[in-house]
């Protein structure tokens, strides 16, 4: 019961009454009209009319008491139901709206509209307006609501701090009572005294009670709370328990005639406060002086300055409650009163020793603990004020630790995970790892879909969705690990394309895995990584690691660009349709040299460099639209080792692979095309120069490593095609590995010396 208002009321209001007061106080008020007409709670119908005239009706007129005021009824659940009233006809007629919503300004405005309808006898408009609001779902904060042409409002935000002049209650309270009496009343409320506030204006009286009680936030007055006391309940002032009661000045003489002991009385009309206690001196002097100086500033008079000044005082007094929160494995989070009090100064310690026994503080702590242990958590302006003001005596990270515990499912759930049996823990890790894989797959699909929308899709091509997985470096051998670490401390690429570092990620996990314990030490929370996730990652066809071979080719392309003018990486034929592509071989000499390299690169004949689609179009094979596949660093390293070992073990014959040669009259079906991989082709061939050993595929032999002649086009090895097709047409089944071998040889030549002379070319031909 940390708050007294109902969180989710069913309706905007429950009842509207028109009550008539008789001339004699001995006669009960009479209900003239009600809405809805079928309202059947007789107890409410009998009690509400008596609260509509909380003054001496025989002595006071409407001009003396004002128009608007509010009373409060408490239901069986200790929740407050507000009665918003407006006096008319000289104080003899009262309109009352009963609601669980503390919308003071909204209902005061609605009462004025209803009074106008009654004065003009517009009963149809009156019923239509009430019916529209009664059937309207409870709107959220700051939502405009239109009831009729002349009636509309914006729902207030009751969770925020009250502001001046928007809050009528706080405005009237701040204007009617000076700063010193506000501080004395505040201190008396913190000590839970018996408090009476009196005034001749009902509107000012009820505003002072509601305004003073609101300044206790985030705590709430937990005892008897009657903003305005009707004549038949004056004996409540003799109750031995704490109370906060408002009494009209016409009835205060009757109250003083009763035996009152230890009662604090605030007279708003004379701005005087009578108290047998000196509660203000028991508060820490630094807190009181800071609050007093803040309230006296002119800038505090508007906005939320007054409410925030009291909020800061509350944070200074009670903000260290976070340091007294205790957590033991297997038990809910608890609050240690001894720890809350013992480390304070003498004045603060004396006050807190009294404060821990206050009902408003106990309800506040119980509400916080209930939210923490239920896993809901809390984040309000009070917690923000504690953090910003540094009123928590412990580590600044302590509150984040509790929030982290809540996010992990509450203290009880966290205990269940850490104290679970190995079987339960393994199941938890398995579910967690597969949930991560599923999330990564969804992100990769969304990313691939965005790429398709951005670059378009090629008709007739098979689309694929790469599955990005985390790479397990522990299972690699030492040689692969060295090759993958060619670029030291290479940041990995995340699923959304951003770069991150493993060390930073580990630090974040370590920082997030701290929770506080009873003795103030910090223990680590458990972050489980499933062993099953590693197996799932190995089976993934593609990986999100960097393409090292592609970067090597990029480097070679950059070096070769200095030797001559280069054309764009992709020709315009890349965007041509499949029917427009011509694959007729040319009969010119393609031997690369220093003289004709620039001509080859800048040649207008794009048939030589249209490697983006020619292979798939030539054989009718459907390849992925992306020119560059992503492979894992482990698989790529393995391919490079295979290429190096096979190239060293067995020299390649002239029919297989040779260096660049000069061909005078190239035959259409034999010979070797000696055209090097120019920089234009390196961009498109980069994604194709990758090898993937699929299950069931025969080991590659050096005899199969051949490059196509000038009469045939280089084809890309498709791993999902059956091996039976290789025996039918050898000219069409040249694998991707052939291109890799040729690229490696030619890349070495480019890297050693791009100035290819005539002597080296004749030596290679021999």
UniProtKB/Swiss-Prot annotation:
Q: What happens when the gene is disrupted?
A: Mice are developmentally normal and fertile but accumulate more splenic and lymph node CD4(+) and CD8(+) effector/memory T-cells with age. TH2 cells display increased TCR-mediated responses, due to delayed surface TCR down-modulation and recycling, and increased production of cytokines. Mice have increased antigen-induced allergic responses.
Fetch the Pfam families from UniProt.
Answer: dDENN, DENN, uDENN
Q: Reply yes or no: does the keyword Phosphoprotein apply.
A: yes
Phosphotyrosine occurs at which residues?
A: 500
Composition bias of kind Basic and acidic residues appears in: 722-732
Q: Which residues carry this modification: Phosphoserine?
A: 516-517, 530, 533, 632-633
What sections of the sequence does the record tag as coiled-coil? none
Cysteine pairs bridged by disulfides in the record: none
Q: Which residues form the dDENN domain?
A: 298-375
Region of interest (Disordered), residue spans:
472-523, 611-634, 652-732
Segments traversing the membrane: none
Q: Which residues form the uDENN domain?
A: 14-143
Please describe the post-translational modifications of this protein: Phosphorylated on serine and/or threonine, possibly regulating the guanine nucleotide exchange factor (GEF) activity.
Q: How does it assemble?
A: Interacts with RAB35. Interacts with clathrin heavy chain/CLTC. Interacts with components of the adapter protein complex 2 (AP-2) AP2A2 and AP2B1. Interacts with CD3E.
Could you tell me what this protein does? Guanine nucleotide exchange factor (GEF) for RAB35 that acts as a regulator of T-cell receptor (TCR) internalization in TH2 cells. Acts by promoting the exchange of GDP to GTP, converting inactive GDP-bound RAB35 into its active GTP-bound form. Plays a role in clathrin-mediated endocytosis. Controls cytokine production in TH2 lymphocytes by controlling the rate of TCR internalization and routing to endosomes: acts by mediating clathrin-mediated endocytosis of TCR via its interaction with the adapter protein complex 2 (AP-2) and GEF activity.
Name-wise, this protein is DENN domain-containing protein 1B
């Amino acid at each position: 019961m940390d708050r007294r208002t109902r969180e989710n009321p069913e309706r905007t209001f429950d009842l509207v009454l028109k009550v008539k007061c008789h001339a004699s106080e001995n006669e009960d008020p009479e209900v003239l009209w009600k809405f809805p007409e079928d309202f059947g709670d007789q107890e409410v119908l009998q009690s509400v009319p008596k609260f509509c005239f909380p003054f001496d009706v025989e002595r006071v007129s409407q001009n003396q008491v004002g128009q608007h005021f509010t009373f409060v009824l408490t239901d069986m659940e200790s929740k407050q139901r507000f009665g918003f009233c407006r006096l008319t006809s000289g104080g003899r007629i009262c309109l009352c709206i009963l609601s669980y919503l503390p919308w003071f300004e909204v209902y005061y405005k609605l009462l004025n509209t209803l009074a106008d309808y009654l004065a003009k006898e517009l009963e149809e408009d009156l019923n239509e307006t009430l019916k529209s609001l009664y059937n309207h779902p409870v709107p959220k904060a700051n939502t405009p609501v239109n009831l009729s042409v002349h009636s509309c409002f914006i729902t207030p935000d009751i969770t925020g701090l009250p502001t001046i002049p928007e809050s009528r209650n706080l405005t009237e309270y701040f204007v009617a009572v000076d700063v010193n009496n506000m501080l004395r009343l505040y201190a008396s409320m913190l000590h839970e005294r018996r408090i009476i506030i009196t005034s001749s204006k009902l509107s000012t009286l009820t505003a002072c009670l509601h305004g003073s009680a609101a300044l206790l936030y985030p705590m709430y007055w937990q005892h008897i709370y009657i903003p305005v006391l009707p004549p038949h309940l004056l004996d409540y002032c003799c109750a031995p328990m704490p109370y906060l009661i408002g009494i009209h000045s016409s009835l205060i003489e009757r109250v003083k005639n009763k035996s009152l002991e230890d009662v604090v009385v605030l007279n708003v009309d004379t701005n005087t406060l009578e108290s047998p206690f000196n509660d203000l001196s028991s508060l820490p002097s630094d807190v009181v002086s800071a609050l007093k100086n803040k309230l006296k500033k002119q800038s505090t008079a508007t906005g939320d300055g007054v409410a925030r000044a009291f909020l800061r005082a509350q944070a200074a007094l009670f903000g260290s409650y976070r340091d007294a929160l205790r957590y033991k494995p297997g038990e809910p989070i608890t609050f240690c009163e001894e720890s809350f009090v013992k480390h304070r100064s003498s004045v603060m310690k004396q006050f807190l020793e009294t404060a821990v026994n206050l009902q408003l503080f106990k309800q506040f702590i119980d509400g916080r603990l209930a939210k923490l242990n239920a896993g809901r958590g809390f984040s309000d302006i009070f917690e923000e004020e504690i953090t910003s003001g540094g009123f928590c005596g412990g580590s600044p990270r302590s509150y984040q630790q509790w929030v982290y515990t809540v996010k992990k499912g509450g203290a009880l759930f966290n205990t269940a995970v850490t104290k679970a049996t190995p079987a339960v823990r393994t199941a938890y890790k398995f579910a967690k790892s597969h949930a991560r894989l599923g999330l990564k797959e969804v992100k990769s699909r969304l990313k691939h879909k965005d790429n398709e929308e951005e670059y378009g899709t090629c008709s007739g091509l098979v689309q694929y969705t790469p599955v990005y997985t985390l790479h397990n470096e522990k299972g690699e051998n030492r040689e692969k690990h060295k090759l993958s670490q060619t670029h030291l401390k290479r940041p990995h690429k995340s699923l959304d394309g951003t770069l991150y570092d493993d060390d930073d990620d580990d630090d974040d996990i370590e920082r997030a895995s701290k929770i506080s314990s009873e003795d103030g030490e910090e223990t680590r929370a458990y972050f489980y990584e499933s062993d099953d996730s590693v197996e799932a990652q190995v089976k993934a066809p593609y990986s999100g690691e960097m393409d090292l071979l592609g970067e090597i080719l990029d480097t070679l392309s950059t070096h070769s660009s200095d030797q001559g003018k280069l054309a764009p990486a992709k020709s315009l034929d890349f965007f041509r349709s499949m029917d427009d592509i011509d694959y007729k071989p040319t009969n010119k000499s393609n031997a690369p040299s220093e003289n004709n390299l620039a001509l080859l690169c800048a040649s207008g004949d794009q048939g030589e460099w249209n490697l983006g689609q020619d292979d798939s179009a030539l054989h009718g094979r459907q390849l992925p639209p992306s020119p560059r596949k992503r492979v894992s660093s482990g698989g790529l390293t393995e391919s490079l080792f295979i290429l190096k070992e096979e190239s060293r073990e067995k020299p390649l014959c002239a029919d297989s692979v040779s260096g660049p040669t000069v061909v005078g009259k190239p035959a259409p079906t034999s010979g070797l095309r000696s055209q090097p991989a120019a920089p234009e082709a390196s961009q498109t061939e980069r994604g194709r120069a990758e090898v993937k050993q699929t299950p069931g595929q025969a080991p590659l032999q050096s005899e199969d490593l051949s490059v196509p002649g000038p009469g045939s086009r280089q084809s890309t090895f498709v791993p999902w095609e059956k091996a039976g097709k290789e025996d039918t047409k050898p000219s069409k089944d040249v694998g991707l590995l052939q291109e890799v071998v040729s690229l490696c040889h030619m890349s070495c030549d480019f890297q050693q010396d791009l100035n290819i002379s005539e002597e080296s070319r004749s030596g290679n031909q021999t």
